[in-house]
């Protein structure tokens, strides 16, 4: 078996954050070392030439466990220029997603030449609990062709001092959940069922379980692993919207991690990230039914209807009660969505388009990226 791991990162601040926190967590015994003991591992890093030295000296530890390849933006074509030139002439607030998409496509094109290969797409600030990568491999050995998981976003300014005091010691899952609970970013906090300032774009709904953890229902988990298929390479949106569902056509081939005990990971973002967001409506059944019609595909239901348990301390009775409530809530959302679709007039061109996006194959899904390209021609 083979694994080809992807990350794209550039600039001193971001590279040093990657090696100090993300890479340090990945070098825990149950992560890359466990993977490299049972499979061939290539770790492909996309960056610019000016950033190459910032990976030192920590990258030498990774080279003992995996083949490490650097691919430079200066050597990649984007339209009629080098990708590095496109980066320098683009809006810095949105360029990361474009770079990630283009470089991950390049990574997948390189990997498709290898047999028995699985792709692992990582963000440069993913911090994993020890044993996470081993669990991904365990599920692949059992026959799963893809692995999905959802991260907890942390406030960078608060979490970094804590993580710095702990790493490179391996992080336990419960330890990382507690860090997530105590230093959670305002963005996921706005997605709790009882949030005082609800999100305008509720991609997940979270439920507190006292001080023992929380439960999350999520539409768009991250594609942590998938076996290569030609249909995946030319995805258009950000990778969490469609890659997993292009990777597997049969839901049983996909493993969705529903317990932090098996795999836990966090992402660190500045507190100012999405800091100017306005408050949305409370996530009532009707609000969420409209959200699923206009912002998801029916196959995302696979994730949303299966709550994820983030466990900091045991309380089986409390977790089961919240999970039952979360499942009932999700079931009601989709029932209401069916009723709303039945009420809309068939001649409505806008509704017809979104009904196809929601009910059709994943290739028909109008993601935010596709919507932004089509907004001038979409029916009003």
Predicted features and spans:
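N-terminal anchoring/stem segment of glycosyltransferases
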Residues: 1-78
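Short, solvent-exposed loop/turn segments at secondary-structure junctions
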Residues: 10-12, 50-52, 125-127, 152-155
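Conserved catalytic core of nucleotide-sugar-dependent glycosyltransferases
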Residues: 85-87, 91-97, 103, 107-108, ...
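Short beta-strand-to-loop acidic/aromatic patch adjacent to the donor-nucleotide binding site
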Residues: 112-129
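Long C-terminal appendages of very large multidomain proteins
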Residues: 214-365
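Boundary detector for helix-to-coil junctions that initiate low-complexity/charged tails
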Residues: 357, 362-380
């Amino acid at each position: 078996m083979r694994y080809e791991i992807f990350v794209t990162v550039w600039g001193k601040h971001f590279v040093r954050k990657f090696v100090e926190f993300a890479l340090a967590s990945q070098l825990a015994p149950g992560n890359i070392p466990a993977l490299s003991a049972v499979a061939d591992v290539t770790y492909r890093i996309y960056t610019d030439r000016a950033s190459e030295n910032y990976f030192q000296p920590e990258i030498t530890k990774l080279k003992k466990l995996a083949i490490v390849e650097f691919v430079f933006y200066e050597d990649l074509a984007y339209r009629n220029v080098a990708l590095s030139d496109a980066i320098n002439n683009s809006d810095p607030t949105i360029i990361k997603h474009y770079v990630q998409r283009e470089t991950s496509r390049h990574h997948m094109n390189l990997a498709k030449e290898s047999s028995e290969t699985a792709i692992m797409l990582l963000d440069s600030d993913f911090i994993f609990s020890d044993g996470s990568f081993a669990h991904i491999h365990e599920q692949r050995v059992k026959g799963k062709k893809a692995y999905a998981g959802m991260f907890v976003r942390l406030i960078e300014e608060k979490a970094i001092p804590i993580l710095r005091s702990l790493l490179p010691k391996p992080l336990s899952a419960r330890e990382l959940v507690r860090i997530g609970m105590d230093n959670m970013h305002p963005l996921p906090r706005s997605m709790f069922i009882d949030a005082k300032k609800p999100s305008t774009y509720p991609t997940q709904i979270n439920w507190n379980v006292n001080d023992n953890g929380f439960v999350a229902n999520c539409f768009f988990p991250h594609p942590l692993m998938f076996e290569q298929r030609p249909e995946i390479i030319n995805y258009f949106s950000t990778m969490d919207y469609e890659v997993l569902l292009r990777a597997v056509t049969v839901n049983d081939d996909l493993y969705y991690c529903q317990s932090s005990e098996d795999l836990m990971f966090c992402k660190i973002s500045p507190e100012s990230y999405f800091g100017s967001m306005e408050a949305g409506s409370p996530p009532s059944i009707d609000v969420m039914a409209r959200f699923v019609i206009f912002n998801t595909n029916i196959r995302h239901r696979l994730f949303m209807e299966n709550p994820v348990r983030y466990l900091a301390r045991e309380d089986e009775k409390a977790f089961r009660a919240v999970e039952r409530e979360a499942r009932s809530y999700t079931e009601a959302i989709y029932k209401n969505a069916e009723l709303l679709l039945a009420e809309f007039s068939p001649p409505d061109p806008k509704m017809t388009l979104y009904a196809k996006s929601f009910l059709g194959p994943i290739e028909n899904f109008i993601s935010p990226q596709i919507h932004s390209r089509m907004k001038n021609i979409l029916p009003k």
